[in-house]
């Protein structure tokens, strides 16, 4: 369910300050953040943001199609290794 238009998009203040500083200085170093809940804004386009997935920081290069989505959508938290093989079929 989307957020109310009356409230507007959410972004953590500390992340917004980091983004503005990086855009102002032209720095291309990845910005480390734990804020998976923050919305991607248009001024983030072209930046690499390292989003924490619970274990490590996953680098996410922000493109124009990502604007409006949350940072956490691009850093998966669960690893799927597949279902266990069928032991009966393996023996034959």
From Swiss-Prot:
InterPro entries tied to this protein: Ribosomal_uS19 (IPR002222), Ribosomal_uS19_bac-type (IPR005732), Ribosomal_uS19_CS (IPR020934), Ribosomal_uS19_SF (IPR023575)
Domain of life of the source: Bacteria
BP term (GO), one: ribosomal small subunit assembly
SUPFAM superfamilies linked: Ribosomal protein S19
One of the Pfam families matching this protein, by short name: Ribosomal_S19
Keyword vocabulary terms for this entry: Ribonucleoprotein, Ribosomal protein, RNA-binding, rRNA-binding
Gene Ontology CC, one term: small ribosomal subunit
GO terms assigned for molecular function: rRNA binding; structural constituent of ribosome
Transmembrane segments: none
UniProt record similarity statement: Belongs to the universal ribosomal protein uS19 family.
Function per UniProt: Protein S19 forms a complex with S13 that binds strongly to the 16S ribosomal RNA.
Listed name of the protein: Small ribosomal subunit protein uS19
């Amino acid at each position: 369910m989307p957020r109310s238009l009356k409230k507007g998009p959410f972004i953590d203040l500390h992340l917004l300050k980091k983004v503005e500083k990086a855009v102002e200085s032209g720095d291309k170093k990845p910005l480390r953040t734990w804020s998976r809940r923050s919305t991607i804004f248009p001024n983030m386009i072209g930046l690499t943001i390292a989003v924490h997935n619970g274990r490590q920081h996953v680098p996410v290069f922000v493109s124009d199609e990502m604007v409006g989505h949350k940072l956490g959508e691009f850093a998966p938290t669960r690893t799927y290794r597949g279902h266990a093989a069928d032991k009966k079929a393996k023996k034959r």
